[in-house]
Amino acid sequence: MSIKKLQILSLLSLSLAAPMMVTPMSAAQDPVDNDPYQWLEDVTGDKAIEWVKERNAKAESSLTTSDEFKKLESDLLAILDSDARIPFVSKHGEFYYNFWRDKKNIKGLWRRTTLEEFKKPAPQWEVILDLDKLSAEENESWVWKGASFLRPDYDRVLIDISRGGADATVTREFEISTKSFVKGGFERPEAKGSLSWIDRDHVFVQTDFGPGSMTDSGYARIVKRWKRGTPLAAAEVIYEGEQTDMLVAAFHDDSPGFERNYVQRNVKFYNDELFVLDENSKLVKIDAPNTASKSVSRGTLAIELREDWNRGDKVYKAGSLLFTKLDDFLVGKETIEVVFEPSPTTALASFGFTKDYAILNVLEDVKNKVTVLRATPQGWKSEPMVGAPAFGTVSVSPVDPDESNDYFMTVTDYLTPTTLSMGTIGQAPQKLKELPAFFDAKGLKISQHFATSQDGTRVPYFMVAKESLSLDGNNPTLLYGYGGFEISLQPSYNATVGRAWTTQGGVYVVANIRGGGEYGPSWHQAALKDKRHRAYEDFAAVAKDLFARKVTSPTKLGIQGGSNGGLLVGNMATLYPDLFQAVVCQVPLLDMKRYNKLLAGASWMAEYGNPDIPAEWSFIKTFSPYHNVVENRKYPNVLFTTSTRDDRVHPGHARKMMAKMEAQGHSVLYYENIEGGHGGAANNKQSAFMQAIAYSFLKKQLFGKESQ
């Protein structure tokens, strides 16, 4: 088991001879303290819900009544419900577990099978828990959130479920053999938090214990040890963080021979302390930088640096991955090995451990290269990953790191159906499963390009288009981006994009802008706080490059993003309105004056800054769309979507922006799903509907009709 970091998308004339030179519109003046739409933050208030229903009805009338919409929704649902999807599994004991939703099982089945059976084209599954049945019995809309097993017997699990897909969960102890919840077992009431096994009769619990027990970010401030048979109120306090911390948590590493307890204190999003909790409940801090990501696997401490680290007479470079023996490190006898050091074009995408090896997955210009490290008495030695493909987005994960050197490998790109293979390090993997072609990719191609941002930075982007694309500036184009929280956007097979967009004549573009993790920590840090504008300049640069290459033009360009990507496209609409015709803004942040007071918003101040500090608000206000939208400017047509049950990014952001733009007379539509959490949908049917609405809107705006 690894202790992992805690941590989730108009110009009227155009010169075709040269790139566009477009200057972003300036930010609006400081907002007045009185917010006339703050009442829309009352998530389930009668007045607010009535307002939502009225906007939903308008969006439905505009976007969902045609035969084309109904066919698209049906096609997307068929993809999402398809039995031909890959049932990805995780190994626990001798069984391989999977959670599955389809047309019949809307809320889903938690099920298992054997490896021998899983290798068959149509495996037989043993159902362990039926979420539809449970929801019906309890008159709740339960959404699966995961399960953790008690080792080494694997007979008990702690199951997390949530109402409507919210981040707040309920945890219940479950008996595998009887396929039932344990009467009188461990059970945690609904809150943002968790239970984690220590042993059969003890768990760590971090949850809402009452007033003062949660951080400003809305997560647990206190972690306790809870003994079976005692009330939750009697649990022993292990650690208390500060009110201003992001969260605290405790974990038990149950790897045989390496058993230890750990406490993690996340001071901020990119700042945490990791402690060893000894048998006397004493905390021993692991003396690695707070800004580094720290994890432990089978006695090896891995340190992933976000900043340069001066230690002794050495300087370890930001973006590097370091390995050392934890026991030695704790007593100052460590020998630190640099197992990866970045170059200007490379970054560590991920790493993991099998029993005897480490697997490194490196991005080079947003393309994967996988290598293996073998533990030897002389240190970690690099070897090629046998069977790793030269092209495609590659993901490799250990099957059971305490027992074997087996791994799962997935390979995908925008046009090639995803494959799942299994192998042992040193041997070529065997393909187990492959998606069918959910859309006809014949005549389509993937290409990578680089735009030049305002400060000269090269910004990569991927484009999916017809091989015979006419470079006349008249192609309906959808540009997607995120640009935050170290998230890298890599090519992957997206059947809904293929079915709804690229096979219909649309061009699909994904921008790898700063703020993401495509080039490591420096790429992310280049767009933090007062440098946030660089992410938006990068996105604008990609749009201008598409114009310069005559792929599209402002009246044919739409953009889409969700969450932080919703903030991105909200800013592109308000700061660069002449570049775009249509905007799909999903589960967004938009009111950056109050974001830190809404739900989990305080946890993101390391990314955006603190609006309560005047010096920081002075730059935050420049990328707060809610405060920068004005009446006398022409903006792109916008569709806002969100979820009532989103308890991470408050639906008030989208609600208030919609209300303000609507009152100012701009062309806006709004749809709010009553369930769904931050993902926007609680089941496949809702997901198909929400995606169909977005594509229906984009087609109307960019094709001039719902389908070509």
Where do the model's predicted regions map?
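Polar, glycine-rich mid-to-C-terminal structural blocks
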Residues: 220-266
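Non-catalytic accessory segments flanking enzyme active sites
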Residues: 50-149, 160, 247-266, 270-306, ...
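Short, conserved, GDST-rich strand-edge loop motifs in beta-rich repeat architectures
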Residues: 162-163, 207-221, 305-316, 487
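Beta-propeller blade signature
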Residues: 111-114, 172-176, 220-229, 274-279, ...
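Blade-edge beta-strand/turn elements of extracellular beta-propeller
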Residues: 125, 176-188, 230-242, 277-286, ...
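Asp-box/WD-like beta-propeller blade repeats and closely related beta-sheet repeat scaffolds
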Residues: 124-146, 156-161, 166-202, 206-213
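Active-site-proximal cap/loop segments of hydrolase catalytic domains
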Residues: 497, 503, 510-708
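Cap/lid segment of the alpha/beta-hydrolase catalytic domain
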Residues: 132-153, 160-168, 180, 185, ...
